[in-house]
Amino acid sequence: MYHITRRYGFAASHRLHARQLGAEENRRLYGKCNNPYGHGHNYVIEVSARGPADERTGRVLDTGRLDQLVRNQVLTPFDHRNLNAEVGAFHDVVPTSENLAIEICRRLKTNWSTVFPGEWPKLHKIRIAETERNIFEIEADEIQ
Ligand code: NI
């Protein structure tokens, strides 16, 4: 059994602001990340799959198919977007990298079988680096 990871990147802006909390509490909680006009990140995401090497091809997955899935579900909808305003999932959910990781994982998981219809490979985990020092990881089995 192998784990294979492929790396992608996109740029997006966001503002950390919880609607259910007041202005002062938002400022206290999120600091400069709560600035009204937002700020940007060059996100690096790593998508990991697991599975055996296919007997015929000697490969775990077709990276071209994975690229197509990630492009359609993540890069096209998120790149050069404002996450709060332009991604429906973040109208009411704060676009922290924790929540972004869940949203990316959910999108890939939901559409995985259309690109990889067989038993293998399976989506294993998503890792997202918001900055060089802030890295978030979630396993596909942990979300619905
Ligand atoms: Ni930020």
PLM ranges: what are they?
Residues M1-Q144:
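Charge-rich, low-complexity N-terminal segments
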